[in-house]
Amino acid sequence: ASELASHAVDACILALPNGHAAACVDSLVAGGADPVIVDLSADHRFDDDWYYGLPELTRDRYDGQKRIANPGCYTATALLALYPAARAGWLPDGPVIIDAKSGVSGAGVKPTDTTHFCSVHGNLSTYNVGHKHRHVPEIEQELAEYSGHACRIVFTPHLLPVSRGILETIYLTTPPEVTLEALHACYSSQYAGEPFVQLLPLGQGSTLAHVVNTNRCTISLHSAGAPGEFIIVSVLDNLLKGAGGQAVQNMNIMFGLPETMGLE
């Protein structure tokens, strides 16, 4: 971190392990410098002085800030899937169940016994079962902000034997008068004109193939067979819309450039 103080930079994207970004920020602003900083770690996601960088949901919070906290990859997948329902007042008081699956790159670059090829190939496993994953408080905080009431998440992450991509199956209970067509219309209206959110037509399902190597989140909506019960399938590439691509999108916003620059 000390080496950064000798470099005058206009912008910096920090892709460091959790707990290491704060020292680098201090070095970057040493001597009165004020660069644009996007932090991909979890260090500043709960800091009110940092803009929470999921612009499809938080554009109204952006007011020229030069510090952006990138959302977590699981978090972005879940929030994009639930935001329209939250805004419409359709999130339940009870828990929302999220069954999440991620490619191995979501576990980081350091090999472990559980992420080694021999452990992952031909296998499917859970980890951080319960309320343990660090993205759970982040999801709950943002959903409470959008819905106006506390939201509890039951979240189970799984490790997929693929290199990249996240697929979340989300079980949503709304007021019984909400129909699948009404839910789809709500999502269609919310994401109209968003270049990086794709809402599939009813009857189609989201797959990793829709999003791998793109900065796009693809969402499909399904009936669970009873009034007000729905299944949402949300997918994105954890290395792009869930990390580096989202950082570029945020950097574009901070410099007044088209959000899609470098990402199409």
Task: List where the protein language model places each region.
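N-terminal Rossmann-like NAD(P) cofactor-binding subdomain of oxidoreductases
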Residues: 1-123, 127-129, 148, 222-225, ...
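NAD(P)-dependent Rossmann-like dehydrogenase/reductase catalytic/cofactor-binding core
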Residues: 216-264
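Predominant activation on well-ordered alpha-helical scaffold segments within soluble catalytic domains
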Residues: 79-86, 136-140, 184, 188, ...
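C-terminal substrate-binding/catalytic lobe of Rossmann-fold NAD(P)-dependent oxidoreductases
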Residues: 1-7, 15-16, 93-100, 104-232
